[in-house]
Amino acid sequence: DELLEILDIDKSLLAKVYESPEVTGTILPEIAAKTGLSTSTVVVGGAGDNAAAAVGTGVVEDGKAFTTIGTSGVVFAHSNNISIDPKGRVHTFCCAVPGAWHVMGVTQAAGYSLAWFQENIGTEYARKAKEQGCGAFDLINADVQKTPIGANRLIYLPYLNGERTPHVDPNCRGVFFGLSSMHTT
């Protein structure tokens, strides 16, 4: 309320805020008809993708964490105590468990880097995959398995869309570092 007053925002303009597991109502009859669900199916406040995944994977108490790799890559941990990184490198938010927090680090282009590579550098993989009746990523992964650990000192910084952890910088850009004549496609 104090912040709304400082910003001169009428509280009546805002929707009610719910905790993640709080029941907010039931589904509408037309939605029930389209989905085959009962009209008594409850709707809850919900949670973001990783916060919901934390509940589903049992990461709901101190000392538990998980990682996900999709477009981005996330290390996600539950905390009963708030811990704010003043530099913003690690993010702390209310979690899906009322009264608790989640702490996470995010790299913006984890899995997306693979898609970018396949679409821009590894286009030959798509052609070969079509010929062989498999997926381009199957062929890419097979070649990755043949690559020596350390990739002959080639380092890739996956900052295709800026970065959040450990560098909060939307202008960060990706780099292949250490590229030499020993590296081939």
Question: What is each PLM-predicted segment?
Answer:
Residues 9:
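Active-site-proximal cap/lid insertion segments
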Residues 12-22, 103:
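A glycine-/small-polar-enriched, mobile loop at the entrance of the PLP active site in fold-type I
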Residues 1, 5-6, 23-25, 29-185:
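Active-site core segments that coordinate phosphate-bearing ligands/cofactors
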